[in-house]
Amino acid sequence: MAYQLIAVDMDGTLLNSKKEITPRTAAAVTQALARGYHVVMATGRCYRQIAPYMRRFPAMRYAITSSGAAVADCMENRIISSQNIAADTAAGVMRAFVGLDGFPIIFSNGEALYRPELLNDPQRFGMDAYVDNFKANGTAAEEMERSFLATPYPVEKLDFYFTDAAERAKFLARVQGAPAWVVPCESAGVEVNATGVDKGSGLQALCRCLNIPVSAAIAIGDSENDCSMLRDAGLPLAMGNAIDDVKAASEYVMPDCDHDGVAEAIERFLLAQR
């Protein structure tokens, strides 16, 4: 099988531990794009939040955003596939959060809405690495939860970051059985998407749009929310810093995010093809 596309998770995969793209990785991505391969960011971030990274690669056209809820054509600045959480389901999940020590984020129409208090003490919620991106590409919303619960609307995704894993466990217990897909992320975070929506469904939707068999796609990641696209891709790859479930779902383990794992994957499995 000749591979035509690689879907690349961002945090802990494309980005190193400093949230940077290394020179070798940038060069490999640029070379793959120049040779006509699709290099696709597959991320939990919304469309607006990936804009600074997309600008690094003018030839990069597509992105899987909000953990598969929205697939974007970045050159035409439009969403080509979207699957939102229903308003009543999103409201129920938000109500389950009320009273817990955490930080909610609403992803809607390519935007990330957050409470401005995030900027006061981001380290408390494990969000310090994301502050600059939120300042530049997020939308601060006063009394966000109260406003949303008063007038719910469909959303791409809900994220919650808690002070610790114990507080996250309380939330997970409350939303057990909710008609949504609830996936833990990072050390004390949770992502919520519509049922059936994940990075794997986003990858399938993009492949259909491009008329590419999903078996011709490579996927690489490090976290639990990457497992779905690894299961669907023709070649699943794990980063060296990946959790055990990701490594178990992969055919090969690349170096970690601080040692150019994505660059090696592109060089070895795309650029080396004849």
Language-model features, listed with the residues they occupy:
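Residue immediately C-terminal to the conserved phosphorylatable aspartate in receiver
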Residues: 10
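Conserved acidic, metal-coordinating active-site core of Asp-based
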Residues: 96, 100-220, 224
